């Protein structure tokens, strides 16, 4: 028997079947670095329209986690897809380098500033530590396949950036948004510093819940308001609180002007509380017998005075919109030094903003004899005992509730009035302008707009000062006596900024005021405060984007971070940009959800359900991690587990196998010499290119809309359905058995070439390593990297007016599916071993029959059978099976006639008819020794 294997055009490629990504990717990365791939892309894109995704800086502390990976991969997908869409999209990664977490790490090793090291040496240690953290994180980000200017990232501790942060504050001061005041701010007694809203987390805490009686200073005045002539015992206004320690700072009791308040007689005393809460309060107090003596609106009780239960003064009843009926008594204990609502209402009524608590959380001397020097969280029991002793405690119980805590220490925090510097939301219309700017931004998902609007509408003034060592100095001088800013404050800040640009923030601490103040140095002192780190990152639109040459003065198009950043970076950036420039710093804001495990639980080391990106890359490769990110809907929680990553790896294999099939069958194809013009191609090949064109239209729209999971789904559908289960199956016969240089085969290769050129680009933003690998195996001259080009423009499709248009082939797909069902049943019944052992008769209604007949003898190639006939539906044989999908079709199957050709595996009656090739069929003889078969349709 002759061996005809050498006469076949068998697929051949060096592109490996197995990705082996964990081993192969590092070598590709080394090549990208050696070649300066990022620089090559920038050069190729120079002069194109820009798209700037400004990197929100991660904090330079600790290893990257799965959330970091999601964030950086999403950014990289966007930057790469924008590049392919014809944009110049530079990506400058950044790091947030100042602040308390770094201070705490350095303290743990070296002690607090002033112990073993001077403050200057301590700052140097902080800078060193941050630099090492940046290096560690950078390696992992690069390993993810993220392309960017990793050699020149921006760091908030770069001298120039530090200087520009000071300049940003100067601009805000110049625009009139800064003010100083003693305001209640989130205060961590462990940090001994004010906290930003974004540094506050909420945890459950058990606190005493108490009802306290404030006796009326003038009982007759109260009785007159309620229209009663006598009561049994003293009259008291009842407040409810879960923070007894704040009672020394009480300066008023707030009522709602429109609520009804009742005067309730119980045994031996009369109590004032909201009428709607009387029943619940009486149950709490255990008062079964009570009488409502009268009711009045809260507004009627305004400015009546009540005696503080243990301090030696009276406090007024005042009116506020913050009073609710959700819990308590409808009368709110008001301490302007310990709460933002209390402060606002206190300002309205001219109340003292009392703060009896020191920075360490202990009461200051002179607060109250039994409280002086006591930590506030240990004082609750003392205050409760004091109230009981004074006869003012009506009820006490334990209550578990959500309580604000420091995100670093996980310990409860307090509101504490301290002298701080604030960016005012209202004194120059910052709130109003910010809300206006929000409407001009595209929020993705769109619910982000309502979220940040609500936050801006309700947020307090932004406390930007901190009492820390490692941070950008506020660089202000204030008068020794009046504490007013120096009249040349902005000019002086520029002088400081110039010095910081040369020597870093230490230049401020080393500065002798006389050097820039001259004679004024005797009257003015340096403000020791540093800036909130959210000011550092929030001003990068000015300190980085506005000054980096690659951004060429363009504002950022997009900010992209986790959904917690509405109150973090998105907020601080919006506040600073609007205060500086009157406009938002971004055009689009995209947020992604948090990562959870396969059961939807939050990632936690204690549960043991964390997924390490380093482990995933070392085991499966970065492209699998990237494919998981892209295939997950980032608008909600993003579930990840070993099983979910295994599914991503399965999807990857399907895509890789498709690419390998394309490359293997392009063996020997030169696009310059062998390309077949569209009009001369086999119709099925043109259809396949049209499928790629339709897929590309969908994929490009999905990239444009940042719907990456849609990109992956469409890519998978193309590989699995249109290619894998139809086209690639059909063309194997023609590709392998036709004459190597025939139009029939070159037409097929031309289609595969067009498809591969498009496919590799669709993959590039997501599976970057694999796309780069494929690119190296594609035939023809090309740029060195797929990332420097644009979406493939060589695709085309069938004309709608053609007889064999897309609709025609869609129907053929259905027919083939119905034929496959019959063949599968015959295989199960052992009637045939494979589809080429079968011949089918298609009994079809006239319209469908005409479509099938149009293919002539090539119908069998579409159906992957050795024989195929078309007959009248009405003449269907008894064994013909009715199609469930196509009512006008019945399919009958029989064993194919003739012998199996060992070369093409088709069964045919002309095997051995040519003496020189007595073992093979006539078609194969023609393809080996003759002119070769002609294909027109399939």
From Swiss-Prot:
Recorded catalytic activity of this chain's protein: tRNA(Ile) + L-isoleucine + ATP = L-isoleucyl-tRNA(Ile) + AMP + diphosphate
Cofactor list: Zn(2+)
UniProt-listed Pfam families: Anticodon_1, tRNA-synt_1, zf-FPG_IleRS
The protein's name: Isoleucine--tRNA ligase
InterPro entries per record: aa-tRNA-synth_I_CS (IPR001412), aa-tRNA-synth_Ia (IPR002300), Anticodon_Ile_BEm (IPR033708), Ile-tRNA-ligase (IPR002301), Ile-tRNA-ligase_type1 (IPR023585), Ile-tRNA_ligase (IPR050081), M/V/L/I-tRNA-synth_anticd-bd (IPR013155), Rossmann-like_a/b/a_fold (IPR014729)
Sequence motif 'HIGH' region, residues: 58-68
One annotated GO molecular function: zinc ion binding
Subunit composition and interactions: Monomer.
UniProt-listed GO biological process terms: isoleucyl-tRNA aminoacylation
Keyword Zinc: yes
Domain writeup: IleRS has two distinct active sites: one for aminoacylation and one for editing. The misactivated valine is translocated from the active site to the editing site, which sterically excludes the correctly activated isoleucine. The single editing site contains two valyl binding pockets, one specific for each substrate (Val-AMP or Val-tRNA(Ile)).
UniProt cofactor note: Binds 1 zinc ion per subunit.
Keyword tRNA processing set for record: no
GO cellular component, one term: cytosol
Binding site for Zn(2+): 901, 904, 921, 924
Keywords, comma-separated and alphabetical: Aminoacyl-tRNA synthetase, ATP-binding, Cytoplasm, Ligase, Metal-binding, Nucleotide-binding, Protein biosynthesis, Zinc
Short motif 'KMSKS' region, span: 602-606
Function recorded in the entry: Catalyzes the attachment of isoleucine to tRNA(Ile). As IleRS can inadvertently accommodate and process structurally similar amino acids such as valine, to avoid such errors it has two additional distinct tRNA(Ile)-dependent editing activities. One activity is designated as 'pretransfer' editing and involves the hydrolysis of activated Val-AMP. The other activity is designated 'posttransfer' editing and involves deacylation of mischarged Val-tRNA(Ile).
Family of the protein in this entry: Belongs to the class-I aminoacyl-tRNA synthetase family. IleS type 1 subfamily.
EC number: 6.1.1.5
Gene3D superfamilies: 1.10.730.20, HUPs, Valyl/Leucyl/Isoleucyl-tRNA synthetase, editing domain
Main EC class the enzyme belongs to: ligase
NCBIfam families referenced in this protein's UniProt entry, alphabetically: ileS
Annotated gene: ileS
Positions of ATP binding: 605
């Amino acid at each position: 028997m002759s061996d005809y294997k050498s006469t076949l055009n068998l697929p051949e490629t060096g592109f490996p079947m197995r990705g082996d990504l964990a081993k192969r990717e590092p070598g590709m990365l080394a090549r990208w670095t050696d070649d300066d791939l990022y620089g090559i892309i920038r050069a190729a894109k120079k002069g194109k329209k820009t798209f700037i995704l400004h990197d929100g800086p991660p904090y330079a502390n600790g290893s990257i986690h799965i959330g970091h990976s999601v964030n950086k991969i999403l950014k990289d997908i966007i930057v790469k897809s924008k590049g392919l869409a014809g944009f110049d999209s530079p990506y400058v990664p950044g790091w947030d380098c100042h602040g308390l977490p770094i201070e705490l790490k350095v303290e743990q090793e070296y002690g607090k500033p002033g112990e073993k090291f001077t403050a200057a040496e301590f700052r140097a240690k902080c800078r060193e530590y941050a630099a090492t953290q940046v290096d560690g994180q950078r390696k992992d980000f690069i390993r993810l396949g993220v392309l960017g200017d990793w050699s020149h990232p921006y760091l908030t501790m770069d001298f120039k950036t530090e200087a520009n942060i000071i300049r940003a504050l100067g601009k805000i001061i110049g625009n009139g948004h800064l003010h100083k005041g003693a305001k209640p701010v989130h205060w961590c007694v462990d940090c001994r510093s004010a906290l930003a809203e974004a540094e506050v987390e909420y945890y459950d805490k058990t606190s005493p819940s108490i009802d306290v009686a404030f006796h009326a200073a003038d009982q007759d005045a109260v009785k007159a308001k309620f229209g009663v002539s006598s009561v049994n015992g003293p009259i008291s206004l009842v407040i409810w609180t879960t923070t007894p320690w704040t009672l020394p700072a009480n300066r008023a009791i707030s009522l709602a002007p429109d609520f009804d308040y009742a005067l309730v007689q119980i045994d031996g005393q009369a109590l004032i509380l909201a009428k709607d809460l009387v029943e619940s309060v009486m149950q709490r107090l255990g008062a079964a017998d009570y009488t409502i003596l009268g009711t009045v609106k809260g507004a009627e009780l305004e400015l009546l005075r009540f005696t503080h239960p243990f301090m030696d003064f009276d406090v007024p009843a005042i009116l506020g919109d913050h009073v609710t009926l959700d819990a308590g008594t409808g009368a709110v204990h008001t301490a302007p030094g310990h709460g933002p609502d209390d402060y606002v209402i206190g300002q309205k009524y001219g109340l003292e903003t009392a703060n009896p608590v020191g920075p360490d959380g202990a009461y200051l001397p002179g607060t109250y004899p039994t409280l002086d020097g006591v930590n506030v969280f240990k004082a609750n029991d003392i205050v409760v005992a004091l109230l009981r002793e004074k006869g003012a405690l009506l009820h006490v119980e334990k209550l578990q509730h959500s309580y604000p805590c420091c995100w670093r220490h996980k310990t409860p925090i307090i509101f504490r009035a301290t002298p701080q510097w604030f960016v005012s939301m209202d004194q120059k219309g910052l709130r109003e302008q910010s809300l206006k700017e929000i409407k001009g931004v595209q929020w993705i998902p769109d619910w982000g707009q309502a979220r940040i609007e609500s936050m801006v509408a309700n947020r307090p003034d932004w406390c930007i000062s901190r009492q820390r060592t490692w941070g950008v100095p506020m660089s202000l001088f204030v008068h020794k006596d009046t504490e007013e800013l120096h009249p040349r404050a902005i000019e002086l800040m520029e002088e400081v900024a110039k010095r910081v640009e040369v020597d870093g923030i230490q230049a401020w601490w080393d500065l002798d005021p006389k050097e820039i103040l001259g004679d004024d140095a005797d009257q003015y002192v340096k403000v020791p405060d540093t800036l909130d780190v959210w000011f550092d990152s929030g001003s990068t639109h000015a300190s980085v984007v506005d000054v980096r040459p690659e951004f060429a003065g363009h504002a950022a198009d997009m900010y992209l971070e986790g959904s917690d950043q509405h109150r973090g970076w998105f907020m601080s950036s919006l506040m600073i940009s609007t205060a500086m420039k009157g406009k938002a710093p971004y055009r689009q804001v995209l947020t992604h959800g948090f990562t959870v495990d396969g059961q939807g639980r939050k990632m936690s080391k204690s549960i043991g359900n964390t997924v390490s990106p380093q482990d995933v890359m070392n085991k499966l490769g970065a492209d699998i991690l990237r494919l998981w990110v892209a295939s997950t809907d980032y608008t909600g929680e993003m579930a990840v587990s070993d099983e979910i990553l295994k599914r991503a790896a399965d999807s990857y294999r399907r895509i890789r196998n498709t690419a390998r099939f394309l490359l293997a069958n392009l063996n020997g194809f030169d696009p310059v010499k062998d390309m077949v013009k569209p009009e001369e191609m086999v119709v099925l090949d043109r259809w396949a290119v049209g499928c790629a064109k339709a897929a590309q239209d969908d994929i490009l729209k999905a990239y444009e809309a940042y719907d990456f999971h849609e990109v992956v789904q469409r890519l998978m559908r193309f590989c699995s359905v249109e290619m894998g289960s139809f086209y690639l199956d059909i063309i194997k016969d023609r590709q392998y058995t036709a004459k190597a240089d025939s139009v029939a085969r070159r037409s097929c290769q031309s289609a595969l070439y067009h498809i591969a050129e498009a496919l590799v680009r669709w993959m590039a933003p997501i599976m970057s390593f694999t796309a780069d690998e494929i690119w190296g195996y594609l035939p023809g001259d090309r740029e060195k990297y797929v990332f420097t080009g644009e979406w493939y423009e060589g695709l085309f499709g069938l004309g709608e007016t053609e007889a064999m248009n897309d609709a025609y082939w869609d129907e053929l797909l259905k027919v083939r599916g119905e034929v496959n069902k019959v063949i599968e049943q015959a295989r199960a019944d052992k009637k045939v071993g494979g589809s080429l052992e079968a011949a089918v008769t298609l009994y079809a209604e006239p319209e469908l029959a005409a479509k099938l007949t149009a293919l002539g003898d090539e119908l069998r190639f579409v159906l992957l059978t050795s024989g195929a006939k078309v007959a009248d539906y009405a003449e269907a044989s008894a064994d013909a099976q009715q199609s469930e999908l196509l009512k006008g079709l019945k399919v009958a199957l029989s064993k194919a006639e003739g012998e199996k050709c060992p070369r093409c595996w088709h069964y045919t009656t002309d095997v051995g008819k040519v003496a020189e090739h007595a073992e093979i069929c006539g078609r194969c003889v023609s393809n080996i020794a003759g002119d070769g078969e002609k294909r027109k349709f399939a």
